[in-house]
């Protein structure tokens, strides 16, 4: 593809390389380093004048450092006269801080949106935003892609009893997500209502729906410490489910997450590779990964060529 340059940040170079390979491109030359006072330095190693630039950087790992690196890369390309700069952020940072849910709470997702715009981003590509209203925090185009087509494909190919499954949301907020998947599989859905007093602490769960003698598939956009989904798995098994799977777009898996998954009765915990999972897979055999590089690559190709991206909302590109 002419007049396009693809750069990778430090957060997820494996995913960036997969995207580049699918597009038939070489990753652009960029050198990032830290000064002795921990300031981030970025040097773009090739001309971007008049080019359509895409920078892939996920909101994971050292999130604050990686966010700052992304902002500097965007700005460096912008002031080097690139025609357009698109930030490809598979897992959007600070997405859970999307509303003022208590006195004096910041809306940090809006702040991140402002920072990306001020840095010079012309367009954002992301996946399964924790709160879809974050798109409205921007005054530039935002394409929020969905892992759902890839999830449906994985279910059909890997769960032999998928016609006897029930799709379960671990909280009321995910009801729209699970009903969409259930409708497309032509199966039923259920949800778990949770009462939470503190972040990452689940106090009480109420199952709404009948899971008896069915394969239960928990679906959510992300899991952090995994307290919710592990409690949900116990709830589903006690309610008569024959097997329990969890499918998540963003597997953050911090703190006690891995030990909780190992102790829980999951057949598998399936995540996409919006966040690197290689190290976690070494400590947990239940984790399986869906590659979404083809979705990002096709979104980049369509954006560059001025084509519609909405096809990707319902199809997995080859």
Curated annotation (Swiss-Prot):
Q: Which residues bind ATP?
A: 96-101, 130
| SMART domains tied to this protein | Pribosyltran_N
GO annotation, cellular component aspect: cytosol
Which cofactors, by name? Mg(2+)
Looking up Gene3D superfamilies in the UniProt record yields:
3.40.50.2020
Supply the alphabetized keyword list: ATP-binding, Kinase, Magnesium, Metal-binding, Nucleotide biosynthesis, Nucleotide-binding, Transferase
Recorded GO molecular functions are: ATP binding; kinase activity; magnesium ion binding; protein homodimerization activity; ribose phosphate diphosphokinase activity
EC assignment: the record states 2.7.6.1
Q: Which residues bind Mg(2+)?
A: 128, 130, 139, 143
The EC category is transferase
Region listing for Binding of phosphoribosylpyrophosphate, in residue ranges: 212-227
Q: Which domain of life is it from?
A: Eukaryota
**Regulation of this protein's activity per its record:** Activated by magnesium and inorganic phosphate. Competitively or non-competitively inhibited by ADP, 2,3-bisphosphoglyceride or GDP.
Query: Is ATP-binding one of the keywords UniProt gives this record?
Result: yes
Function description: Catalyzes the synthesis of phosphoribosylpyrophosphate (PRPP) that is essential for nucleotide synthesis.
Subunit details: Homodimer. The active form is probably a hexamer composed of 3 homodimers.
Q: What is this protein called?
A: Ribose-phosphate pyrophosphokinase 2
Q: Which organism is it from?
A: Mus musculus (Mouse)
């Amino acid at each position: 593809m002419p007049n396009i340059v693809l750069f990778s940040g430090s957060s997820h170079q494996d995913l960036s390389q997969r995207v580049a390979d699918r597009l038939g491109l070489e990753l652009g030359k960029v050198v990032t380093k830290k000064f002795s006072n921990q300031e981030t330095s970025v040097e773009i190693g090739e001309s971007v004048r008049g080019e359509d630039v895409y920078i892939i950087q996920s909101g994971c790992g050292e999130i604050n450092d990686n966010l700052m690196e992304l902002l500097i890369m965007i700005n460096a390309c912008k002031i080097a006269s690139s025609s357009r700069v698109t930030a490809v952020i598979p897992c959007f940072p600070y997405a859970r801080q999307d509303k003022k849910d208590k006195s004096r709470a910041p809306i940090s997702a809006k702040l991140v949106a402002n920072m990306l715009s001020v840095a010079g981003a012309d367009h954002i590509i992301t996946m399964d935003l924790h709160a879809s209203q974050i798109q409205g925090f921007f005054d530039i185009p935002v394409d929020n892609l969905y892992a759902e087509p890839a999830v449906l494909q994985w279910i059909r190919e890997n769960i032999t009893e998928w016609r006897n499954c029930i799709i379960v949301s671990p909280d009321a907020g995910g009801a729209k997500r699970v009903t969409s998947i259930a409708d497309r599989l032509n199966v039923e859905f259920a949800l778990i209502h949770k009462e939470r007093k503190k972040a990452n602490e689940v106090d009480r769960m109420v199952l709404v729906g009948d899971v008896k003698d069915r394969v239960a598939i928990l679906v959510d956009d992300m899991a952090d410490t995994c307290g919710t989904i592990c409690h949900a798995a116990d709830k589903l098994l006690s309610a008569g489910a024959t097997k329990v799977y969890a499918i998540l777009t963003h597997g953050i898996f911090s703190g006690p997450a891995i030990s909780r998954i190992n102790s829980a009765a999951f057949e598998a915990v399936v995540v996409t590779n919006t966040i690197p999972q290689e190290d976690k897979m070494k400590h947990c055999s239940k984790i399986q990964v869906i590659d979404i590089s083809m979705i990002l690559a096709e979104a980049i190709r369509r954006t560059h060529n001025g084509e519609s991206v909405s096809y990707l909302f319902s199809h997995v590109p080859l």
